[in-house]
Amino acid sequence: MNRTDELRTARIESLVTPAELALRYPVTPGVATHVTDSRRRIEKILNGEDKRLLVIIGPCSIHDLTAAMEYATRLQSLRNQYQSRLEIVMRTYFEKPRTVVGWKGLISDPDLNGSYRVNHGLELARKLLLQVNELGVPTATEFLDMVTGQFIADLISWGAIGARTTESQIHREMASALSCPVGFKNGTDGNTRIAVDAIRAARASHMFLSPDKNGQMTIYQTSGNPYGHIIMRGGKKPNYHADDIAAACDTLHEFDLPEHLVVDFSHGNCQKQHRRQLEVCEDICQQIRNGSTAIAGIMAESFLREGTQKIVGGQPLTYGQSITDPCLGWEDTERLVEKLASAVDTRF
């Protein structure tokens, strides 16, 4: 009989289960309390109960655990310095959506060479998240793959659904199940309505099919996530200006949703010129000083060293520099955070 299935499958390998990985890298009581408390603080900011600003900042993607931990240690110092004005959360992105092809992140390809040692990538990701949370720094990530979240979601304080997946039904259903607040980016064309629709969908109960922590295929029924919000990330043109934010809030108001959002300084808002994140910061700070309460948080891409680099076989990588989108360096990061804290002073 002719085969009719898996005709294009090149490789199948056993995957560790989320339960097995959690046994190897368990959540400690201290980390569990830290994650729970961090989520609650973020929820209060998104609801307008806390006047502080949510600051989600870090490398475009994680590829080097040593550099990531050095960044986290420095970020913890900034958290301590500005905790009365800012809720600083580290961007820990392990999955990268690609427009066509490219490196898809630490979990998929931890060795950066196309070997796809996913089990090792999952171990590295969970290990790093535990270490960063143990420092006292909350973590944020994008939930891209429908299975990967099962391995790390218990260590995440804030999640994102990206511009390419906000319109996806299954991602909206997944967001309705997540235990952390979830931001939905506007579409790559700048369309914010799809993010509003995603927020509405994620608030509802859904049923979807998914493996559980033990790898058993199950039917999941969710209760809905009340902490969805828009991430203004720009599109063909920036959308961080006051009139753009007002228009987004009008749409939120139309559907009786909280008029609080997050502004992404990078991506379409900086028109892929990483130093323009500083210009976006200046504009957002002025809006805050002018009395804007809609801006609940910001996102920015920064690392130890400015810019980006390409992966070249046989050549060492520059320590602390991005291998995906270009990032601000550490000195600019300190200046950016200081400016945000100063602007938020006017809310008190």
Swiss-Prot record:
EC numbers, comma separated: 2.5.1.54
Catalyzed reaction equations: D-erythrose 4-phosphate + phosphoenolpyruvate + H2O = 7-phospho-2-dehydro-3-deoxy-D-arabino-heptonate + phosphate
Example GO biological process: aromatic amino acid family biosynthetic process
Pfam families the UniProt entry points to: DAHP_synth_1
A molecular function GO annotation: 3-deoxy-7-phosphoheptulonate synthase activity
Entry keyword annotation includes Mitochondrion: no
Keyword annotations from UniProtKB, A to Z: Amino-acid biosynthesis, Aromatic amino acid biosynthesis, Transferase
Family matches, as SUPFAM superfamilies: Aldolase
Class of the enzyme per the UniProt entry, highest EC level: transferase
A single GO cellular-component term on record: cytoplasm
Pathway membership, UniProt: Metabolic intermediate biosynthesis; chorismate biosynthesis; chorismate from D-erythrose 4-phosphate and phosphoenolpyruvate: step 1/7
Keyword Amino-acid biosynthesis: yes
SS bond partners: none
Sequence similarity: Belongs to the class-I DAHP synthase family.
Function comment: Stereospecific condensation of phosphoenolpyruvate (PEP) and D-erythrose-4-phosphate (E4P) giving rise to 3-deoxy-D-arabino-heptulosonate-7-phosphate (DAHP).
Name of protein: Phospho-2-dehydro-3-deoxyheptonate aldolase, Trp-sensitive
